[in-house]
Amino acid sequence: MIIGLGDIYVQIPHRQVAEGVMTEASRHAQAEDGCLSFTFAEVLEEPGHFVVLERWNDERAIERHYRSPAFADYQRSIARLLVRESEYRLHRVQDTSHPVDSVRIVTDQDD
């Protein structure tokens, strides 16, 4: 699995426009073959700072995404709204997910 993690810094007056651009990009990416999830979220303590979290089956899937017209549209649209250049990293990971009892984790930390 490939995980993409990025930081996007948007001009405060253009946050709503950026949210629309991100919503459209997320919708397109989630419909692509090999996309497991694609989400944007704004950092609560830092308005205008958005994080993107993507999960892809493999390199081929993310390469297809980068070549898609929707990704090119996103790049063009978001570029004019940025305060500074975005930061983005890809990580190759093994899928080792398993259920976790979050109540137990909190309880164990309190001991």
Q: Where on the chain are the PLM-derived regions?
A:
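An amphipathic, aromatic/His-enriched active-site/gating alpha helix that lines ligand/cofactor pockets
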Residues: 24-36, 55-90
